[in-house]
């Protein structure tokens, strides 16, 4: 296989809503989740909308765990007992929902609309979410990108994770694997220009 792109996690924030709370975008860089919640509450209070929007799935919880090098699956086995990063991630997530800092949407279109309609001051997801964030022309220049918060009290916690990405692969039933590998190598595997042309679109 051949890696194609990476969905590095980002936090996209509305700079205008942050400024309404007397804060700056820089105030949201390199935070722990407890520091984030404190600042996010000010944004919620100043704007009357949640700081973050979520698609209601496990993406954000997985990103939180991943940022600390943890996973709910270890060596192919589900590991939820004695998983400190999972426990802390769930605690933070629930706390944000309870405080109105995080809004959950189970419908993808509503999730995207919450960003575009000003119903949230930010979102954490893979960097691919930026195209959705940029869809509202009237918000041009009002969004900024920072790194995500890191878990408090968890060894190895960082402000970085991944959500998504893509790879090309040659299946085992390919009739001409050598030709297929050569195609991948000579196109996606060796052409920066092709990447530059494909990825923005």
Language model feature labels by segment:
Residues 1-5, 9, 19, 34-78, ...:
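Extracytoplasmic/periplasmic solute-binding protein
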Residues 9-13, 65, 168-170:
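Short glycine- and hydrophobic/aromatic-rich loop-to-beta-strand nucleating segment
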Residues 16-28, 99-101:
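Aromatic-glycine-rich donor-binding/catalytic loop that engages nucleotide-sugar donors
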Residues 21, 99, 136-200:
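Extracytoplasmic/periplasmic substrate-recognition and gating elements
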Residues 30-37, 103-117:
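Short helix-initiation/N-cap motifs at beta->coil->alpha
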Residues 37-42, 76-105, 148:
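Glycine-centered hinge/linker elements that transmit conformational signals in sensory
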Residues 57, 108, 125-130, 164-166:
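Beta->alpha turn/N-cap motifs
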Residues 121-126, 144-146:
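Paired acidic/hydrophobic, glycine-rich loop segments that form the ligand-binding mouth/hinge
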